[in-house]
C-alpha cells in the first residue's frame, strides 16, 4: 500500500483559575507530534498525476493546484500529520483543519464570565429543547504553529481572538456561539461543548 502509517501523540495541559464569584480564567497548552512508522508514496511525479496534473493540458492554474495538492500529500506521506489547527476548538478565526503538519503547538487563554444562574428556564429553539441552567460570555486569545520539522515549530505563528456566548443546559450540554478574528479575517462558529474538547 502507498498509504502512510503514523501515530499521533498529543499532550494537553489546562489550568483553571476561579475569579469573581462564579467565573473562570482558563489557560490551555497543546503539543502534538506525528511519529511515522511507514512512509507513503514519496515520488512527487506519481503524486502530481494522482492529483490530476496529467489532465491539465498546460493550464497553469490547474497545474499549480495539482502540484500544491501533491506537495501536501507528500508532506503527509513523509512526516505524518498531527493535531490540526483551525475550526471551533483551536484557532477559531480559521476554517476547520486550516493548518496541519507533523508537529503542532497551540496555546490559549479564555475568560469565562458566568453572568446568570437563574436556572430552569425552558428553551425551545429549532432542534434544541432543554432547560437553561447558566448563561456565559467568553473572551479568548489563542496562538498556534504547525511545521514539518520540530526545529521550525514556532517560527510561523497564527493568532486568533474573539468572544462568545454560551449556555449550559439542564441535560449537561453546553451550546456555544463564538466570533473570532485573526490573520485571515473573521469567522463565526456554532458548536456544542467547550473548546479544546477532543471529538471522535
Model-derived segments and spans:
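Outer-membrane beta-barrel transmembrane domain signature
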Residues: 114-120, 124, 128-132, 136-161
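Repeated loop/turn-to-beta-strand initiation elements of outer-membrane beta-barrel proteins
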Residues: 20-25, 116-119, 167-176, 198-200
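Transmembrane beta-strands of outer-membrane beta-barrel proteins
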Residues: 11, 25-31, 107, 135-139, ...
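C-terminal outer-membrane beta-barrel translocator/porin domains of Gram-negative envelope proteins
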Residues: 1-130
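Residue-level signature of outer-membrane beta-barrel architecture
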Residues: 15-17, 111-113, 167-169, 179-181, ...
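Transmembrane beta-strand segments that form the barrel wall of outer-membrane beta-barrel proteins
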Residues: 1, 92-96, 137-145, 173-183
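Outer-membrane beta-barrel "beta-signal"
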Residues: 165-167, 186-200
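Solvent-exposed loop/turn segments connecting transmembrane beta-strands
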Residues: 1-5, 97-106, 151-158, 179-191
Amino acid at each position: 500500500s502507498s498509504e502512510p502509517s503514523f501515530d499521533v501523540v498529543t499532550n494537553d495541559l489546562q489550568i483553571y483559575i476561579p475569579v469573581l464569584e462564579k467565573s473562570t480564567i482558563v489557560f490551555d497548552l497543546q503539543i502534538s507530534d506525528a511519529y511515522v512508522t511507514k512512509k507513503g508514496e514519496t515520488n512527487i511525479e506519481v503524486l502530481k498525476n494522482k492529483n490530476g496534473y496529467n489532465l491539465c493540458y498546460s493550464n497553469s492554474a490547474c497545474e499549480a493546484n495539482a502540484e500544491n495538492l501533491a506537495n501536501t500529500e507528500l508532506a503527509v506521506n513523509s512526516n505524518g500529520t498531527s493535531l490540526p489547527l483551525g475550526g471551533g476548538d483551536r484557532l477559531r478565526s480559521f476554517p476547520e483543519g486550516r493548518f496541519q503538519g507533523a508537529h503542532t503547538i497551540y496555546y490559549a487563554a479564555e475568560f469565562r464570565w458566568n453572568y446568570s444562574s437563574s436556572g430552569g428556564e425552558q428553551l425551545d429553539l429549532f432542534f434544541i429543547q432543554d432547560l437553561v441552567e447558566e448563561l456565559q460570555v467568553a473572551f479568548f486569545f489563542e496562538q498556534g504553529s504547525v511545521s514539518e520539522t520540530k526545529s521550525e515549530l514556532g517560527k510561523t505563528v497564527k493568532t486568533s481572538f474573539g468572544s462568545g456566548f454560551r449556555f449550559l443546559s439542564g441535560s449537561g450540554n453546553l451550546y456555544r456561539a463564538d466570533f473570532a478574528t485573526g490573520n485571515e479575517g473573521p469567522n463565526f462558529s456554532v458548536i456544542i461543548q467547550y473548546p479544546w474538547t477532543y471529538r471522535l
